[in-house]
Amino acid sequence: MADVEVETEVAAGAQPKKRTFRKYSYRGVDLDALLDMSTDDLVQLFPARARRRFQRGLKRKPMALIKKLRKAKKDAPAGEKPEPVRTHLRNMIIVPEMIGSIVGVYNGKTFNQVEIKPEMIGHYLAEFSISYKPVKHGRPGIGATHSSRFIPLK
């Protein structure tokens, strides 16, 4: 009896475990449904700030960005990443249609390339392109304290 159990465990252990990936869902709606959803239904899932933005309507510039992203995706060969699309529209809200695109988001100095992933839905492009250099707290500068008069200048 014990020998039979050992054999089944060995047989089960011989097969490699298949990796399972978590299916992405935004507020309980899976990605496939999000892509098929109309804009009005999608807006109902967004937080209040994003809902207000969409209710006021997408103006000319955001629509132009979406058209450029569509064109870049269409022109890309199958299985390849699309060409990056540069933009200054840091206040653009990421929608499911943009997933898989590469956007160059301007931070005031350079265009930071951002690949749009499903987890980014509902966020602003600016959140993924930092516009300042984070402070590195270190040694005090010249004139910071009275004792700094005795620090030799470099």
Curated annotation (Swiss-Prot):
GO molecular function, one term: RNA binding
PROSITE patterns listed in its UniProt record: RIBOSOMAL_S19 (PS00323)
GO cellular component: cytosolic small ribosomal subunit
GO biological process, one term: ribosomal small subunit assembly
Disulfide links within the chain: none
PANTHER family to which the protein is assigned, alphabetical: RIBOSOMAL PROTEIN S19P FAMILY MEMBER (PTHR11880), SMALL RIBOSOMAL SUBUNIT PROTEIN US19 (PTHR11880:SF68)
Family classification: Belongs to the universal ribosomal protein uS19 family.
Protein name: Small ribosomal subunit protein uS19
Phylogenetic classification of the source organism: Eukaryota, Viridiplantae, Streptophyta, Embryophyta, Tracheophyta
Gene giving rise to this polypeptide: RPS15
